[in-house]
Amino acid sequence: ETMLGDTAIAVNPKDERFKSIVGKTVIIPIVGRKIKIIEDDYADPEQGTGALKITPAHDFNDYDVGQRNNLEIINIFTEAGKINENAPKEYIGLDRFEARKRILKELKDQEFFVKEENIKNKVPYGDRSNSIIEPFLTEQWFADAEKLSVKAKEVVNSKKTNFFPENWSKTYFQW
């Protein structure tokens, strides 16, 4: 289903098989969006066809490829794991697993599907939910804990804030 957010196809710069098509564009089936064929060392000529679809919003390695090649980042998931408005309308709102099934069917119906193979792949699961974790870009912010700790220590040292029992203040300062 992440093909809905693909923004390039990468081939290895040393792979002579693809030299004549680097820089050209292809159209993503179902989506109809044109994407470029790019060169990037991340593409492994010995793995699969040697050409790799790049989805920067939903794969950590693809994100790095996207940054190196100034690729667009298209997020196709909501925070709840459903397909968002960046996908064709018939997929919007579908659960990611249902979307995957429908996309596969549509690829077969349109005769784009070539073959299916079983491969071993490491898939991350949540510790508590046991759900598959999908890479998902979000806004992040960071605080300077060292600067914040100055005031936090000060209020305990000056007794404006007290711990009961007192020995917990030692634990507080160790943190």
List each language-model region with its residue ranges.
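NTP-handling and nucleic-acid-processing catalytic cores
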Residues: E1-A80, V155-W175
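A glycine-biased structural micro-motif
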Residues: F18-G23, K89-R100, D109
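Short acidic beta-strand-loop surface patches of small beta-rich interaction domains
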Residues: G81-N86
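Phosphate/diphosphate-binding loops
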Residues: D95-V123
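Short coil/turn segments at secondary-structure boundaries
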Residues: E116-K122, L137, E166-T171
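Short cysteine-rich clusters marking metal-coordination/redox-active sites
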Residues: G126
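Flexible hinge/switch segments at interdomain interfaces of large molecular machines
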Residues: F142-N157
